[in-house]
Amino acid sequence: MYEVSRVRVSGPLAVHVSGLVGCLAGRGYGSKSTVEHVRRLAQVSRWLEREGLEPGAVDEALVVRLVGALHSAGKGRSLAPRSFRVLLGFLRSQGIVPSERVRVLTPIEVLLDGYRNYLVVERALAAVTITGYMGTAGWFVSEACANDPCRVAALSAADVARFVVGVGRVRGPRSVNEVVVGVRSLLRYFYLKGLIDRPLAQAVPWLARGRMATLPRTLEPGVAGRLLASCDRGTLVGVRDFAVLTLFVRLGLRVGELTAMEVGDIDWRSGELTVRGKGGWRDPLPLPVDVGDALVAYLTRRGPSGECRQMFMRIRAPRGPMAMTDLRAVVRRACARVGIADTSTHRLRHGLACDLLRHGAPLFEIGQVLRHRDLETTAVYAKVDFAVLATVAQRWPGSES
């Protein structure tokens, strides 16, 4: 049995045990996990008492010292500072300890922080896209500017080309093109803010790689149905996972769009779903009956989730909105259940497009379903319509058919 009452707590944090227990219960933590976090509180509280410190002194540095002292005493060998994150979060949320101290940014960090704000506010990019762009930006200013903001104004086309060529030596073609896109974005920002006096984004070389050079990676016919059938709809997790997979398979939604989906995005009277897409776009889609049924079953089983408006929630602790990694894990588990290789959520999107193509849907309709802004993006699926391609293929010289 795991009972909180068995944990001896003394010191200035002892009065907060009940608050921590209530917070953990509200987030779905079980008795075993709750007891472990109360033990962390007891360790910190005893340390404060021994050192004569107030609760406000608790921070990451104190935790590191505490863990080091325990290790030196031969205790808690498996204990790490990250084990105290939940406790620190609780203490800060209650105002018991101050928020994380704001670190003074270096000049180059100030520059990159301005770029991040530009991506968020003016470009309205998704969080995952911003993360990729910021990684490229940090790499570029480190290599091309030696982490010195004063050298940004002196950037030349040769510096830009030299950086991209260097990336090409250590990265594959797909990764290089992602870096190229990020560097172009950063240089456009520099020019927009007057940090450089020439539009150097035009000097970024592209890697020669045709958009139509590869086939879209899709699913074999029938696999999508097997993934859906693998969900145990007798459980809340199974009902939720079935709804998630249904949206991937039937509407071809992107994983970020499922993450952003809120309960209020569905207009049940008109049978319409508003998708929060890339670039801040909001696209209305008709809600098929089977998709609506899957969502109704999940929401009915899930019940109210307090003030949180997100559609998909974690069932296990810590409860809260599902992140992209959680949604990808739903697909990964389904693949394991049906005995197929792990597949990406985007391959389910490709699978929908190819299935529509097999049933005679024209490319422009497929583009509407997938919400492509450019028909050229949809044109890649023409390469997998083998029946149509066979009618226009030239016979090989000398062949009989």
Give the location of each predicted region.
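Conserved catalytic core of the tyrosine transesterase superfamily
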Residues: M1-S401
